[in-house]
């Protein structure tokens, strides 16, 4: 990153295609924060956190505050409350795509919910970024890549949740699987590339490559 780790008091976005290693990278950051004596929270909007895997990466799962909210509003309210308490060092939101607004969950099929999630993210980030900075808490938002429909020029990929996160994030990390690692005929892991796409704290566009071994992490 060029600054010796993830910045405190800032928003970090880790994004990439499915199964690219985003959550693994975030859990390693949690483990490092805990090792340094920090308190960590994991807001599991995907309802997919595997405590055994997290423990293998060095996460103290007993000390990790885990919340599995039902709606996007609830997830962001919990985050705001935890950050506002001032006792947290790092919080991970997995993932932005799973922060579904209440109206969408309770609404009828076929109702138009265009822009609801983007508005929810924009309002929440406006409020939360100030608090993160005051309390020196690092927030990691994990985000999925989607294909934009009908794009002929430029990248057809886009992240979910509107433009707010792109704007408010101090660091954005693009994580991709570039190769499957094999031992004989068995797949044992993935070679992964992380590119710093935006960095307000140091020059961006640095690239790191590392291996993620199944069941063990980086």
Swiss-Prot record:
It is found in: Cytoplasm. Keywords: ATP-binding, Cytoplasm, DNA damage, DNA recombination, DNA repair, DNA-binding, Nucleotide-binding, SOS response. ATP binds at residues 16-23. The keyword Cell division does not apply. It comes from the Bacteria. InterPro entries: AAA+_ATPase (IPR003593), DNA_recomb/repair_RecA (IPR013765), DNA_recomb/repair_RecA_CS (IPR020584), P-loop_NTPase (IPR027417), RecA-like_N (IPR049428), RecA_ATP-bd (IPR020588), RecA_monomer-monomer_interface (IPR020587). GO terms for biological process: DNA recombination; DNA repair; SOS response. SUPFAM superfamilies: P-loop containing nucleoside triphosphate hydrolases. GO terms for cellular component: cytosol. GO terms for molecular function: ATP binding; ATP hydrolysis activity; ATP-dependent DNA damage sensor activity; single-stranded DNA binding. NCBIfam families: tigrfam_recA. Belongs to the RecA family. Can catalyze the hydrolysis of ATP in the presence of single-stranded DNA, the ATP-dependent uptake of single-stranded DNA by duplex DNA, and the ATP-dependent hybridization of homologous single-stranded DNAs. It interacts with LexA causing its activation and leading to its autocatalytic cleavage. This is Protein RecA. It comes from Paenarthrobacter aurescens.
